[in-house]
Amino acid sequence: MATTSDDLRARRKAAAENCERWLSHPRVPVQDRLRQLTEVACEDSADVYGNDGDVAALEQEVADLLGKPAAVFMPTGIMAQQSVLRVYADRAGTDRVAVHGLSHLLVHELNALEEVHRLRIERMTSEPRQPRPDELAAIPGKLAAVTVELPLRDGGFVLPTWDELVVFAESCRERGVPLHLDGARLWESTPYLGHSLAEIAALASTVYVSFYKVLGGLSGAALAGPEDVIAEVRRWQRRLGGNLYTLFPYAVSAREGLRTVLPLMGDLYQRAVELSMALQSEGFRVFPEPPHTNSFRVYAPQAADTIETAAVQRMETTREAICGRWQPADVPGWSWIELVVAPHTLDWQVDEVAKAFGELLRH
């Protein structure tokens, strides 16, 4: 028997298909997306198993942006990070890696580090904040690598301050253990940290970046670091089935995101701060306050089913999609969503967004 939540999901899906305006990421028909890729493709020849074409050009662009000697394009970030951590473990002769308890590696990857690579996870903390040097120091013995996710998505998109990140990186160097940055949203982190991509990446041995989130690529990721490490990562990419015959559509879309969306990071961050203030004036709460990136959590003083019903009804009547599905918060009677400020968000006025959200509480 269908539940109220099931009915709301079905209604939301149907309403979304009829929407004509989106606050974050619009729905683009497949045919239109393919035409867009045709218009922006720069290379005449496709890559073959990652060699030449847009893939090779993208790898060089990423290496240059991050100030690293080499980079490799991969179909997924999961594969990229598993591969580099496996390389570090094999080199160090230990299977222990230090990870945040809320990191993507542990929350969303079905224990792949343990199940596939037999790595042992040492949790520095599971608090919704970045790990501290003393928490790393509390883990005894030899470590293969330390990972930091910038920002920590499941902690609320939280970042360290620049000084905190520098001190943490120094603690890794003093211990003689490689620091790996999970930079799935690193592009979005530069305004808050106040430093360039290369300056941030210089604090770590290797860095992973994603192309399909704010940059709007089809899919895919890149890993940047020393040439010898990247060469070994390429071998693991092959072993894990990620060295596809050609990946040029993904690389074309990634390069277009670097050209057109990356320059907007400052504007997106500023709009996130403005929206967080406006939403609070409508009775919502936000975390972190102010936001650290273009993404943050919005909390509503209503039960999830109540405000979700209002959100779906608004989608049905206005054909506007302003938020994702509301989820129950830890506090009874409250609910929350993630709000991502994307390029299309800049087409909305701040007071227009605040009014739209306010309607959900006054429904």
Functional labels for PLM-detected ranges:
Residues A2, G283-H363:
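Conserved C-terminal alpha-helix-loop-beta "cap" of PLP-dependent enzymes
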Residues D7, W22-T76, D90, G101-V107, ...:
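Conserved N-terminal alpha-helix of the aminotransferase class I/II PLP-enzyme fold
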Residues V87-A145:
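PLP-dependent aminotransferase-like
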Residues R120-I121, L179-H180, V286, C323:
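Hydrophobic beta-strand scaffold residues
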Residues R129-G183, E188:
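Active-site phosphate-binding strand-loop segment of PLP-dependent enzymes
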Residues L136, T190-A198:
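Distinct, well-ordered alpha-helical segments
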Residues D154, L159, A202-Q302:
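Active-site C-terminal subdomain of aminotransferase-like
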